Amino acid sequence: MSRKIQRKEQILDAALHVIVQNGYHQSRMDDIVSTSGLSKGAIYWYYKSKKDVYLDLVNHWVIRYSNSLLELPKEDISAGKQLNNLFETFFNQFEKDPIVFKALLEFWSLAGRDTEFNIKLEKVTHNFIQYIESIIKKGVESGEFKQVNPNIAAMSIMVVIEGISWFTLFEKNSVSAKEYIETVFEFILSGLLKRIES
């Protein structure tokens, strides 16, 4: 990893912790400087403003998630298994870095008020829905799934996955994130699978 990439990751990691702690509007570049341990000059070498940092933070996590999804097996595997792997990937990420999901709530809030964040997150969401949609289409075409609207099914799954974020807000929940993921996956899969008539 080059020094430039290391520095940017150090800055973005600090920015992630700052936005979760303070929220976007209460965060300052000085907070990112102190959390990162780098000089102010080093931060401004890469980013001109707080907004630039956080827009790049979205890119950073999109690339990381995209790489994780691309590594999931696609050939010689059923659409149902692909969906299961997708849910497991997001749960594992939640277990590893719940702070990312907490930051996501802040970004969604920003998207409702800021055009640049809105455009950025809309593109991210669109790409992810397309990915899920391709799995649904595969299941429909193979006869594994019912004749459903792939786009609507994909959007529904997207909303369910985003629901993991709410587990970062409350320390005490009547159900665990794992139980939530497993249960809703069963609901979704049972709704998609084509019934075999006896």
Segment roles from a protein language model:
Residues Q10, V18-D52, D56-L57:
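Helix-turn-helix
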Residues M1-Q6, I196-S198:
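N-terminal intrinsically disordered/low-complexity leader segments
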Residues D56, L70-V100, A153-I157, K178-I181, ...:
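Hydrophobic alpha-helical connector segments
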Residues R7-A15, I32, L57, W61, ...:
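Generic hydrophobic, amphipathic alpha-helix propensity
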Residues I11-I19, F90, I188:
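Short hydrophobic clusters on alpha-helical segments that form packing/core surfaces
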Residues E71, K96-I99, T115-E141, N151-M155, ...:
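Amphipathic alpha-helical packing segments from all-alpha helical-bundle domains
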Residues L72-P73, E88-E95, L104-G112, F187-L192:
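Helix-loop "lid/cap" segments that line or gate small-molecule binding pockets
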Residues N85-N92, I129-K138, V160, E171-S198:
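C-terminal peripheral helix-coil segments that are non-catalytic and often amphipathic
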